[in-house]
Amino acid sequence: MGSTMEPPGGAYLHLGAVTSPVGTARVLQLAFGCTTFSLVAHRGGFAGVQGTFCMAAWGFCFAVSALVVACEFTRLHGCLRLSWGNFTAAFAMLATLLCATAAVLYPLYFARRECSPEPAGCAARDFRLAASVFAGLLFLAYAVEVALTRARPGQVSSYMATVSGLLKIVQAFVACIIFGALVHDSRYGRYVATQWCVAVYSLCFLATVAVVALSVMGHTGGLGCPFDRLVVVYTFLAVLLYLSAAVIWPVFCFDPKYGEPKRPPNCARGSCPWDSQLVVAIFTYVNLLLYVVDLAYSQRIRFVPSL
């Protein structure tokens, strides 16, 4: 998983890219991803935002996985101006989260045990159930790669392969869920305090993405300050910022003085501001916990930026 080319005279093709445990997991990702996408596109069907997200997630993961396997097999990854170990570790974690979400959403919104009344309804049901099974297998294939490539205690590795690096991807993913709930009629603009919370989410998200981007591009060595120290300082600040949001957001959304402590009975399903506010509150605490765990692990990581 290094970023250097083989010495002259070596084999041009790297068979270990498809025969090693990690390579086998990637081949299975391609097989399961293509099967899932094809089943849904051919007869299973999809609709709405949820279906579009699932298809986009599967298509994106398949395309990048194919690129990774091709570059590993032909040893062309050494020609790319990025840290290959950081890139593959970050993508595997992101793909795991995307495929996990799709593996939950597609069966929840589209899979049914009963046949639909339209012609060939039972065939569509069978295709959707099969797609749901392969979507779950696809998630497991990416999760296996994350488990195989994760840095072990005492092992020197690329930053994104450490627990702290993997948590950065999860933090950014959770922040995207928060943003999705915020734009879905959460009424965050009513108070300056809730606007502060949005600023916290945005600032921490941008900083996390910057850390991931610098690691993947291999530019962590030219910052004028040790990268691991910067990561620890930023993570500590993120914990403080999220702690403030974890206190402020519930008060200004669910306290009787400012908001609704209970879900309004006349609130329509799918378009209720209270639901969006609850989602934001829950995932604020999730991200706070992730940053606390990240801070604990950041104290003892050892990594090589160029891997």
Swiss-Prot record:
Domain MARVEL, first and last residues per copy: 17-154, 159-303
List the top taxonomic levels of the source: Eukaryota, Metazoa, Chordata, Craniata, Vertebrata
| Protein's cellular compartments | Membrane
What's one GO-annotated cellular component? cytoplasm
Keyword annotations: Membrane, Repeat, Transmembrane, Transmembrane helix
Q: What is this protein called?
A: Myeloid-associated differentiation marker-like protein 2
Q: How does it sit in the membrane?
A: Multi-pass membrane protein
Q: Supply the Pfam families for this chain.
A: MARVEL
| Family membership | Belongs to the MAL family.
What residues form the membrane-spanning segments? 53-73, 90-110, 129-149, 163-183, 198-218, 229-249, 278-298
